[in-house]
Design a protein with these regions (language model features):
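N-terminal type II signal-anchor transmembrane helix
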Residues: 1-35
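Extended surface/linker regions that mediate inter-domain or inter-protein docking
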Residues: 9, 13-23, 132-197, 287
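C-terminal capping alpha-helices of c-type cytochrome domains
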Residues: 23, 102-115, 128-152, 246-257, ...
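Electrostatic cytochrome c docking/interface patches
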Residues: 33-59, 173-205
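Interaction-mediating elements
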Residues: 50, 60, 112, 118, ...
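The canonical Cys-X-X-Cys-His
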Residues: 53, 60-69, 140, 200, ...
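Detector for the c-type heme attachment site
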Residues: 66-72, 111-112, 125, 145-146, ...
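Gly/Gly-Pro-rich "capping" loops immediately C-terminal to redox-active cysteine motifs
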Residues: 70-103, 120-133, 159-172, 214-249, ...
Length: 299
């Protein structure tokens, strides 16, 4: 009996040590500060800027997909023991962060995916938003500041045991875009808003097209998505090369492919892309037509 008790004691001790090690190292991974360099642009407060900010939050950058139509936040993923990901309440209401965050805090979160204290934010598409020009990011921040306060207290983002093991292994690095960015890179000025390839590329970047469909737009598995999630489609000429401009408009506004089948609205936010202007939709179409053909998933 004494021998059995000793063995059990050793086993319990090893398990406790292992769990403690996983917790310590995963916490370090979650909270390791990231340095960045960015000049804060002026924040416009006029009605034109607020309208642009609202448009960006919906039709282009789609902030409302995660933070909710009222920007009051919501649980995005609830999959314990893997983890729970929560998009915070961005307003100044009870449970919101709007009242305690500076304009610089919002800028750092949007363009760099970095939160208070330098910690990397979870599932923040900063590699796309990094491209956002000063006027656009300023307008977006101004709009976020202007929305009515929402009283909504939410649980914190949390990783369970399985998630923490994967954090230590580095398997979840794709969920933290701030870790995979050059935060000192020089940002080119955005092109003028026009039906041009350059403006289409800009919109595809800040709109997250390249975030889901990949840098080359050839599609594939979605970053941070569960293994059983449907892959993003190939948007290169290899995938939609036969689509006309009218086909492209119909897909983004009605959620219907040229063959009449429906796009999956749970993955393709047609309710938001339909709010893009004709100019914006045409510019993106023009850009998509110029990318090199690529086999599916070859980014």
């Amino acid at each position: 009996m004494q021998t059995l008790a000793k063995v059990l004691g050793v086993v319990v001790g090893v398990v406790v040590l292992l769990l403690s090690t996983i917790f310590v190292f995963s916490t370090q991974t979650l909270n390791k500060p990231i340095a960045y360099a960015d000049a804060s642009p002026p924040i416009p407060r006029d009605s034109t800027a607020l309208a642009r900010g609202r448009h960006l939050s919906r039709a282009i950058s789609k902030c409302v997909e995660c933070h909710g139509n009222d920007l009051g936040g919501q649980v995005v993923i609830d999959a314990m023991p893997m983890g729970r990901v929560v998009a915070p309440n961005l307003t100044s209401g009870r449970g919101g962060i709007g009242g305690s965050r500076s304009d610089d805090d919002f800028l750092r979160a949007i363009r760099h995916g970095i939160g208070v204290g330098g910690r990397p934010l979870v599932l923040m598409p900063a590699r796309n938003y990094w491209h956002m020009g000063d006027l656009d990011v300023g307008s977006l921040i101004a709009y976020i500041r202007s929305v009515p306060a929402v009283d909504r207290e939410l649980p914190a983002t949390k990783f369970g045991l399985v998630g923490r093991v994967l954090l230590v292994k580095g398997d979840l690095n794709g969920m933290f875009e701030a870790k995979n960015m050059d935060h000192t890179a020089k940002r080119p000025p955005p092109p003028a808003a026009d039906t041009t390839v350059a403006y289409g590329r800009y919109l595809a970047e800040i709109g997250g097209c390249t975030g889901c469909h990949g840098p080359s737009l050839s599609g594939g598995s979605l970053p941070g998505a569960p293994p059983d999630a449907k892959p993003a489609s190939n948007l290169t000429p290899e995938g939609i090369g036969t689509w006309t401009e009218a086909d492209f408009f119909r897909a983004l506004r009605e959620g219907v492919r040229p063959n009449g089948t429906a796009l999956d609205s749970t993955q393709m936010p047609v309710r938001l892309t339909r709010e893009m202007t004709d100019l914006e939709t045409k510019a993106i179409y023009m850009y998509v037509r110029t990318v090199p053909p690529k086999p599916f998933g070859t980014n």
